[in-house]
Amino acid sequence: MMYEKTAEHFEQKYKNLPEGHLLVNLGPSHPATHGILQNVIQIDGERIVEAESVIGYVHRCFEKLGERYTYNQFLVCTDRMNYVSTPLNNIGWILAVEKMMQVEVPDRVTYVRMIISELSRIMDHIICLGILGVDLGAFSGMLHLFHHRENIYQIIEKLTGARLTTTFCRIGGLERDIYPEFEKEVKLVCKGLKPAIEEFNSLLLKNKIFLGRTEGIGGISAENAIAYGFSGPNLRAAGVDWDVRKDKPYMLYDKVDFDVPIGEDGSVLHRSLVRMEEMRQSIRIIEQLVDGIPSGAWHADLPHAYLPEKNKVYNNMEELIYHFKIIMHGVKVPPGEHYMATEAANGELGFYIISEGEKSPWRVHVRRPCFWYYQSFAELVRGGLLADSVATMSSLNVIAGELDC
């Protein structure tokens, strides 16, 4: 899979197709791709003989931009990776920077970050499962969960001021403290989600037509999933028990009780089952945290890295100087390198940072889970039906913004 795959490449490779074979484009602008993705597929009747995936349509040079932006400015780039669950990207980046700076944040910050992380995970899974149903002709199922997704969006919008590009968190804390009704609204969302998930489960995962279109389709073995670099729900659906929250715990994930759902054959059905159960487990995590959010500060005492409150800037010379230094000179991260992995909705999201002690990183690399899934698409669909390739793509949940970065 390369950026250099041009029309000439495909013309040369497929100029002598066997009789009866046809070359078709699935994308880059097609309802089934859910983003700017292109798959060039060779078919014999309805059977897929070969497939090639093309990336780069949404490439925005984020890693290179990371060398020019300050550590806080790079948050706007993380917003535009997996834009379905933006706060998970923001938190992953901030945790990587805080590790390099050896910053300890108040427990209140960690609790809020974890609650928002799990709400974002639920939002992402709702999109994946709902759109999978739409692609297979079950439009009504999506509507049962999208109402609750909207309720989560409203919480995030109240907290951050935005729905998609949240730029949630800052180095050392949150952008702002939670609003007074935050805990109450989170509880109401969780209460409403529980029966909605079970209803959705009955509508789709107990439907004979849905089962016929997903069971045994687009499967991958545990060995091949590991070889391709799978992580997250797609890896666990193949039978591999690996979750960064459990195996390399961060924040307070080692203090909460939750189960890691595991599938068997890595098929579309098992990827759906894993995501369905993960939503239940996310609710379980949230309910353990929401009643115990500690009082106190919502950011660490970091005058050299965290912007002071506006009223202090206007009335205190020292605070004004800190404000000027952070804005004009940026946050200086000690020299060194660090890789921080978090469990995003699609899998292991990692940020590798090399610092030379300046306001901007010397090098940034993003380990985005979608990149590895997309490489496997040809193997997953080869020999299957063209219609099944749509279900396979949906179940992988490839987000173009994260794929190309």
UniProtKB/Swiss-Prot annotation:
Intracellular or extracellular location(s): Cell inner membrane
UniProt EC number: 7.1.1.-
Membrane topology classification: Peripheral membrane protein
Record's GO cellular component terms: plasma membrane
Principal location: membrane
Biological role: NDH-1 shuttles electrons from NADH, via FMN and iron-sulfur (Fe-S) centers, to quinones in the respiratory chain. The immediate electron acceptor for the enzyme in this species is believed to be ubiquinone. Couples the redox reaction to proton translocation (for every two electrons transferred, four hydrogen ions are translocated across the cytoplasmic membrane), and thus conserves the redox energy in a proton gradient.
Complex formation: NDH-1 is composed of 14 different subunits. Subunits NuoB, C, D, E, F, and G constitute the peripheral sector of the complex.
UniProt protein name: NADH-quinone oxidoreductase subunit D
